[in-house]
Amino acid sequence: ARATFAHKIKKTDGLIHWNAKSREIERLLRAYTPWPGCYTFLPARFRRKGNTGRVVVTGVDFLKTADTDPAWRAELPGTVVACRDRGPVVRTGDGVLLVTSLKAEGARELAGGDFLRGRPLLPKSDMLLEG
């Protein structure tokens, strides 16, 4: 049997780079769940005092082409382009992903729609920032 080398996984490896392809982000999420977890950061206005705004993304889903808006292509990767009942729709490098569940720092895991009811992100004006 031939051995291969794999680097040690660090917590920082889970940072979501929204300019990557949707399929790559979804695979990253599956690979790094439950540890180290895939994460992004909320816009500054949603951060609580003494909180980094780190949000662990625990579930994403692909949208059918019929459910997408061609105008979303003009937005930068990481931009929340729409808010659906199931959660925020975030622009990626080659399309969009629906964030179906996430866990804010110091909080329990929530469905994407429940998260939006507590922190109403505005489409096309708020971004999920990389670190």
Predicted regions, residues:
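Flexible, acidic loop-helix segments that line cofactor/substrate-binding pockets
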Residues: 1-16
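An anion-binding loop in the catalytic cleft
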Residues: 13, 18-131
